[in-house]
Amino acid sequence: MTSKIEKVSEFIFQSHKSGDAFSNLEKDMKPQDFDEAYEIQKRLRQKLPRGPLGGYKIALSSKIQQDYHKITQPVYGGLFKKEIFHSPKTIVLKDYHRMSVEFELAFELSDRITDSTINRNPKNIFSDISNVMPAIELVDDRGANYEGLDPLSLACDNAWSGGLVLGDPICDWKEKDFLNIQSTCEWNQEPKLTTNVLDAKPFENLCWLINELHSCQNELKAGMIIITGSVFKVRQAKTGDKINHILSDHGNVSIEVI
């Protein structure tokens, strides 16, 4: 471990402890590339008092986001095991610096995930999946200004991982045609939003992430949960919000914010 990795991870850790707003890393604090950023992230996760890993998440998953930020790949972060909840879940807003939500598919990993010799692709990825579930991701962006966001700084800060709420697994998911599954957002009494669940390219993103995690020798084991990008735009939550994510007639996940 280099002194820079220790220095930057400690800086971010202290920022979390003191409740400071997120800001881009600058000058000698900014990582050279994603490899260095993820080493900083690993060290930060070791410092944070949030327990062992329970999985991983993706940020900046769409091509539009990547083009805007001048990158060619998503950004990933770790999900902490004790921050993976089951629906219905009451979320206490004051426990977060600034909490937003995203609407995702969640994948529970199978025993095959430990095999690092396989290059994952959409034709073979099903063997790495034991369950598929609707999910609501909790994003804690620490009050960040999204204009001018530096993806390397986001990677260092664990991609703003704030937790996850899961619905029940989809029954016989391997037999489903996901082209026919709609993802619906219900937010209080507002008009519903609906789109195809595959719009966020969940299976393609899952392949990319598993390959990336193995290449960087990250921890991967059966039972971990991976989420791979939101089908709707991220939105800030407020006290009193009641939010549902419904997958056609294949299940739902709900939170209430207090």
Where are the model-predicted features located?
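Catalytic-core "active-site belt" of small-molecule-metabolizing enzymes
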Residues: T2-K201, Q236-K242, H250-I258
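A conserved acidic, glycine/proline-rich C-terminal tail/linker
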Residues: N205-V234
